[in-house]
Amino acid sequence: MVDYYEVLGVQRHASPEDIKKAYRKLALKWHPDKNPENKEEAERKFKQVAEAYEVLSDAKKRDIYDKYGKEGLNGGGGGGSHFDSPFEFGFTFRNPDDVFREFFGGRDPFSFDFFEDPFEDFFGNRRGPRGSRSRGTGSFFSAFSGFPSFGSGFSSFDTGFTSFGSLGHGGLTSFSSTSFGGSGMGNFKSISTSTKMVNGRKITTKRIVENGQERVEVGEDGQLKSLTINGVADDDALAEERMRRGQNALPAQPAGLRPPKPPRPASLLRHAPHCLSEEEGEQDRPRAPGPWDPLASAAGLKEGGKRKKQKQREESKKKKSTKGNH
């Protein structure tokens, strides 16, 4: 017999908030789209977690479960005894996907981490000592508890919202999220973008989750600064993305926009009539030796050798003619 308290990993006296936290953690962990390599077990665990949450999050269902177990929910508890149960004709569990979507208010839970910056200020979370976090009085879950659940036919949704510093501490400037696909379809993909001003600089974080792989791009004032895949920095992917965006080199300045050279002062021309024009100066100015070229040097040595041999032959002829005259 499955124990719903054990499924969620909570005590029998757990508070409703503890049950919500446990469901959130396990539902994200065992969602089939996050476990493509172990989908059968993930679907089974995902269904159990949804059933446990559906029972323990409802006060009446939880009370009957505590007294009579799962049989009480099916209308059979008490060995034929007469007890007042609203589920005497049997309780039917909902589709786990519907429970999941209703819990998260129709928003994409994979687009960002509810406990990570830059969203913790927006949701009222505060960072505690040693990096731990405690939730504020305004729970994220209660904020979206009034949203209706999506029908089972809906497998994709996209949503976004924008704030202008009026919520939290004013650090979050904008956020948008889009999702494609859904459970049972595979090819799940979500894209979220957040923008936050930090010390006068615009920090943009783009998070892409597709079939269990998370890619995070962080830019500063329009320049891509870092790229991680599943939490690990990828320099090759960063260089490729920067090249694709044309961020490797500074834009060249068009020739037509270069400032013209300032004309020479007239007074300087009057007192220095002997000054040469720039063209004349270039012609008369001695040329600085250029960089050494091995091919040119070899050609020069060869030519020099020819001249030396020719000079030696001419001197030899002169000596012979001189001896003949004597």
From Swiss-Prot:
Gene Ontology MF annotations: Hsp70 protein binding; unfolded protein binding
Modified residues (Phosphoserine): S277
GO BP terms, alphabetized: chaperone-mediated protein folding
Domain J: 2-69
PROSITE patterns: DNAJ_1, DNAJ_2
Region (Interaction with KRT18): 119-242
Superkingdom field: Eukaryota
Region (Interaction with HSP70): 2-146
Subcellular location: Cytoplasm, Perinuclear region; Nucleus; Cytoplasm, Myofibril, Sarcomere, Z line
GO cellular component terms given for this protein: nucleus; perinuclear region of cytoplasm; Z disc
Annotated positions of the Omega-N-methylarginine modification: R135
Keywords (A to Z) from UniProt: Chaperone, Cytoplasm, Methylation, Nucleus, Phosphoprotein
Stretches the record annotates as Disordered: 249-326
Keyword Chaperone set for record: yes
PANTHER family (UniProt xref): DNAJ HOMOLOG SUBFAMILY B MEMBER 2, SIMILAR TO DNAJ HOMOLOG SUBFAMILY B MEMBER 6 (HEAT SHOCK PROTEIN J2) (HSJ-2) (MRJ) (MDJ4)
Subunit structure: Homooligomer. Interacts with BAG3, HSPB8 and STUB1. Interacts with ALKBH1. Interacts with HSP70, KRT18 and PTTG.
Job description of the protein: Has a stimulatory effect on the ATPase activity of HSP70 in a dose-dependent and time-dependent manner and hence acts as a co-chaperone of HSP70. Plays an indispensable role in the organization of KRT8/KRT18 filaments. Acts as an endogenous molecular chaperone for neuronal proteins including huntingtin. Suppresses aggregation and toxicity of polyglutamine-containing, aggregation-prone proteins. Also reduces cellular toxicity and caspase-3 activity.
UniProt name for this protein: DnaJ homolog subfamily B member 6
Organism: Pongo abelii (Sumatran orangutan)
Lineage of the species this protein comes from: Eukaryota, Metazoa, Chordata, Craniata, Vertebrata
Gene field: DNAJB6
